[in-house]
Swiss-Prot record:
InterPro entries: DMTF1_DNA-bind_reg, Homeodomain-like_sf, Myb_dom, SANT/Myb, SANT_dom. The keyword Nucleus applies. This is DNA-binding protein LIV4. The keyword Transcription applies. Keywords: DNA-binding, Nucleus, Transcription, Transcription regulation. Residues 31-51, 260-269, 605-618 have a biased composition (Basic and acidic residues). Residues 65-77, 167-183 have a biased composition (Low complexity). It comes from Cryptococcus neoformans var. grubii serotype A (strain H99 / ATCC 208821 / CBS 10515 / FGSC 9487). Residues 383-436 form the HTH myb-type domain. Residues 435-513 form the Myb-like domain. Residues 89-98 have a biased composition (Acidic residues). Its main location: nucleus. It comes from the Eukaryota. DNA-binding protein that recognizes sites within both the enhancer and the promoter of rRNA transcription, as well as upstream of many genes transcribed by RNA polymerase II. The gene is LIV4.
Length: 625
């Protein structure tokens, strides 16, 4: 101890420090600091007294609000009292709305911070009083708004629309937390935003709050039709309900929905009928709506829309090619990327919206064609596996082995055979199935009769399914004819015992049985050829590729498509044997063929006149109709 004391004395002498004086000074500083008073808890009597004071202030505010409303509308004072006496629940409803008013997450966090700071400073009681006064101010404003609406309705004044009724805002105080934004550079050179809270100021007294504005300032009156008292009260009540449940869609207009499927379909069809009165609107809808084949056929059958069918014309092919080229240039795509986009299925694409917009642009280039028909045509046009010509026996064997390994998985089968999915499916189902039991060559009379009987039976079954068991008015209604395009030829082939393929059955029925059922007798080939050439000459196609045989047949319904095409092909073959004629353009070739058909028809008429004399003479091909 003596050594320690000597060391302290040496320090005092070396650094001239008075350790005793310093220690005594610290003791004096500690004595000067006053002790922090502790927070005193309120007694039950004090709490009860504060509650009674709050209730008294609330009653006083209500009375002041009622007096203010009476001063603003003295003429309707009796009406207001009667309305309030009849429906006193409106004031309770306003209080409930104020109590249940939704508070955002930011307001909740701000309120929690304020409570914590008030608690630390011993001002929790003051913040509760402030919050209670805020709610009272909102309630007073809402009551004034309701009273003004009732006054306007009772005095036959113009009632304002509900949308123009302003919601009283929650009064703000100086105790609310405000903030400033600061930007500081971080280590990467960018700026980082920080939110720094400001210091809280003490809450003001209750008397310093800004009083609620009168109800006349909250309701702008506009020149509308006069509303009844009941309508005004209901409008204000709906406004209060919308404030109470802001996210509810009860008061918002809803689209009419039907619980029953039939009514919903009729409503949709009615809207489509109205829209499709404009042909351009129908074309835009077909080019922008992805719709299934069944629904498309239903809409066409019910007469809601019509669309183009059959093969794509040469003009449509050119339009599609131009649309593809423009899309490729605009999006700066390579040919490989364009083909990949075309072959990508929408449901399997990573960016489905891009694929949908692409097909909308392409379908818009061929008005009247639905996307359902445009997609397979464009894919076949750009698919590297397409346009490979006739199937070889080696490809048929490879297709059979691939199908045995992957039944009905046409994507895998297509990659193995190196043909398109559609080609593989059609080749297998139409040609290779039951190939061992199939008959080739000419049809016998028994086969034709059996085919006609099978088609009639299948068509009758289809009609029975369509009417869903409904009774027919007359027995003749079940004997109407069925178009060859509406017959399920896969079922017909099975009913034939798989002795003929789907393609064989379809072609035989279309070219031989169907014209006979329509009562179309066979005409001389010379007259038929002249009629076909006359029709082609009048249509004035640019080239042979532009010919639409279904359009040619519109005025030649007496003949089948095969007969029309054969008449053109046979005459063309006879005239193009001359090298000079073979080098002519299509319009020049049609003129040569027409002249030859007229010459043949005149020769035939003169021969008939020698055999069967008649007073009538046909002089030109135009009179052959």
């Amino acid at each position: 101890m003596e050594g320690i004391e000597l060391g302290i004395q040496d320090l005092d002498r070396s650094y001239q420090i008075d350790t005793q004086a310093a220690s005594s000074g610290d003791e004096e500083d500690r004595q000067e600091v006053p002790e922090r008073p502790t927070k005193r808890k309120r007694t039950k009597e004090e709490k009860e007294r504060r509650r009674s004071e709050k209730r008294a202030r609330k009653e006083k505010r209500r009375s002041e609000t009622a007096q203010a409303a009476q001063i603003q509308a003295p003429q309707a004072q009796v009406g207001i009292e009667a309305e309030v006496a009849e429906a006193p629940a409106d004031y309770d409803e306003v209080e409930q709305v104020v109590e249940d008013a939704p508070v955002s997450e930011d307001n909740k966090k701000r309120k929690e911070k304020k409570h914590k700071k008030d608690k630390n400073k011993g001002k929790k009681g003051g913040s509760e009083e402030q919050e209670e006064e805020d709610r009272e101010a909102i309630a007073a404003s809402a009551v004034a708004t309701l009273a003004q609406a009732l006054v306007s309705s009772e005095s036959d004044q113009v009632a304002p629309p509900v949308d123009q009724i302003q919601t009283p805002a929650r009064p703000t105080t100086a105790t609310s937390t405000s903030a400033t934004w600061r930007t500081n550079p971080n280590q990467y050179g960018s700026t980082k935003v920080k939110k720094v809270p400001l210091e809280l100021s003490p809450p003001p007294a209750a008397s310093s709050l800004t009083p609620a504005p009168p109800a006349t300032q909250l309701i702008p009156v506009t020149p509308l039709t006069a509303a009844s008292a009941g309508a005004s009260s209901f409008a204000v009540r709906d406004k209060i309900n919308s404030l109470k449940h802001p996210k509810s869609s009860t008061n918002a207009p809803k689209a009419i929905r039907s619980t029953r499927k039939g009514e919903d379909t009729k409503e949709s069809d009615a809207q489509l009928r109205l829209r499709f009165k404009d042909p351009k609107a129908q074309e835009e809808w077909l080019a922008s709506t992805s719709i299934g084949k069944t629904e498309l056929l239903r809409l066409e059958k019910e007469g809601i829309l019509s669309y183009k069918k059959g093969k794509f014309t040469e003009d449509e092919k050119v339009s599609i090619k131009k649309a593809l080229e423009n899309y490729q240039k605009i999006h700066r795509m390579s040919s490989f990327d364009l083909v990949e986009l075309v072959m990508t299925k929408t449901l399997q694409a990573t960016d489905k919206e891009t694929v949908r917009e692409f097909w909308k642009d392409i379908a818009a280039s061929v008005p009247g064609r639905p996307i359902l028909n445009v997609q397979p045509f464009v894919r076949r046009m750009l698919d590297p596996k397409a346009h490979k010509g006739r199937w070889t026996s080696e490809e048929d064997e490879l297709l059979l082995r691939a199908y045995a390994q992957h039944p009905r998985e046409w994507t895998k089968i297509s990659s193995i055979v190196d043909r398109t999915e559609v080609d593989c499916r059609d080749r297998y189902l139409k040609e290779l199935v039951n190939r061992d039991t199939r008959t080739a060559g000419r049809w016998t009379k028994e086969e034709e009769d059996k085919l006609e009987e099978v088609v009639d039976r299948v068509a009758k079954g289809l009609r029975a399914e369509q009417v869903h068991g409904e009774e027919r008015e007359t027995p003749e209604e079940g004997t109407e004819l069925v178009e060859p395009s509406d017959v399920p030829w896969d079922i017909v082939s099975k009913e034939m015992g798989n002795t003929r393929s789907m393609t064989q059955c379809r072609i035989k029925y279309r070219d031989a049985i169907w014209p006979r059922k329509l009562g179309l007798g066979k005409d001389d080939h010379v007259g038929r050829t002249l009629k076909v050439l006359t029709r082609l000459k009048n249509l004035n196609y640019e080239s042979e590729k532009h010919i639409s045989w279904s359009q040619v047949r519109e005025t030649l319904e007496k003949y089948s498509l095969k007969e029309i095409r054969n008449s053109y092909s046979n005459l063309k073959k006879s005239v193009t044997s001359d090298p000079h004629v073979a080098s002519l353009t299509y319009p020049e070739l049609i003129k040569v063929m027409y002249d030859k058909a007229v010459m043949q028809r005149g020769r035939k008429v003169r021969a008939d006149q020698r055999d069967y004399p008649s007073k009538e003479t046909v002089e030109s091909g135009d009179e052959a109709y």
